[in-house]
């Protein structure tokens, strides 16, 4: 008979057998295993804490890992936007085909030499009306897709307005993009140069993607590599932002560029664009100072003369 090593003497030397009762209730075994379990839990918690700190540091964008993740995010978003733009372009092509057909039928309808009977006129008018209705529906589909895609883009870039307390403490910008304060003319000299370049690049990417969504060209394909030509960078971003605002009908066609820059600055223009809010400003009724790139450069140079 084999005896338990705790409540009895083992029959086989150097071999300890434990009965079920002692395994479940012996203080010496329970305490030892419980201490081991507590130590193991402490090690696991410490490992979790260390791993969490490493991940936070990596995802924060300060380290190499964070920078690579940001590049990967931009690459993935570009691929997704290219696919979506292709779909939007297909809808636009259908609209163009319908529009051309509509115009052709209108011309045919106005040419009285083609008609011998009233029935023929009625048939052509019916076709024209059907084509016009189809084109209107396709235009609505295109607009809905563009609006939804632009909304996703604004959410992805996290264009937000800072709290008043945070804004008063920073004294840089009231708005952020991807967690970085947005550049503006008012506080251009108070912002760190490295952050200024990062902010410019984020805004440049946002504008470039926006051009793809709304299907028209800008000068945003000119890359922003450094802070050497600040006036050129500011002017380029302001010019393209103003074009987007005009396409979205968020500013007057005869807007005064000086007045809108004084009221909103570049960061405010980007924020209002992301929220699809109308920017009220004075009009340049005489069109004496049109919003050309050259005029914007002169304005930027006069508003930040110390650069």
Curated annotation (Swiss-Prot):
Which Pfam family name is an example for this entry? Answer: ATG14
Q: Name one GO biological process term.
A: macroautophagy
Positions of the UniProt region annotated as Cysteine repeats? 4-22
Location in the cell reads: Preautophagosomal structure membrane; Vacuole membrane
InterPro entries (alphabetical): Autophagy-related_protein_14 (IPR023261), UV_resistance/autophagy_Atg14 (IPR018791)
Q: Which residues form a coiled coil?
A: 36-113
Q: Which UniProt keywords apply?
A: Autophagy, Coiled coil, Membrane, Protein transport, Transport, Vacuole
Q: Which GO terms describe its cellular component?
A: phagophore assembly site membrane; protein-containing complex; vacuolar membrane
Q: How does it sit in the membrane?
A: Peripheral membrane protein
The UniProt similarity line reads: Belongs to the ATG14 family.
Domain-level remarks: Coiled-Coils at the N-terminal half are essential for autophagy.
- Could you tell me what this protein does? Required for cytoplasm to vacuole transport (Cvt) and autophagy as a part of the autophagy-specific VPS34 PI3-kinase complex I. This complex is essential to recruit the ATG8-phosphatidylinositol conjugate and the ATG12-ATG5 conjugate to the pre-autophagosomal structure. ATG14 mediates the specific binding of the VPS34 PI3-kinase complex I to the preautophagosomal structure (PAS).
Q: What is this protein called?
A: Autophagy-related protein 14
What species is given as this protein's source?
Kluyveromyces lactis (strain ATCC 8585 / CBS 2359 / DSM 70799 / NBRC 1267 / NRRL Y-1140 / WM37) (Yeast)
